[in-house]
Amino acid sequence: MLDENHAARRRTRNSRRDPELTRWEILEAAVQEFATHGPRGARTEDIAHRTNTSKRMIFYYFGSKEGLYRAVLEENYRRIRALESSLRLDHL
């Protein structure tokens, strides 16, 4: 679920990685991994494989698996708040 700005900046195989895009792709893969397998079953190796990065890159951006999970929770809460703010509740 990359937003339009991120999708427009998708890299080609021969270009250098955009650090912001790389972090976002790791986060998106982690959202799916944690949703599917839970915090204990999620594997950073699988997230790294999905994003063509390494575990070292994940730890560079998020510090630890726990830090990555925290970022996933924060992103999900951000999305929920964005959806809530788009609701039209004036008539209630």
Short names for language-model regions:
Residues 25, 33, 37-67, 71:
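Helix-turn-helix
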Residues 7-12, 54-56, 84:
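A short small-residue
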Residues 13-17, 21, 63, 67, ...:
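Residues at secondary-structure transition points
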Residues 70-92:
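Amphipathic alpha-helical linker/stalk segments
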Residues 1-21, 32:
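N-terminal intrinsically disordered/low-complexity leader segments
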Residues 25, 29-36, 82-90:
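Solvent-exposed, amphipathic alpha-helical segments
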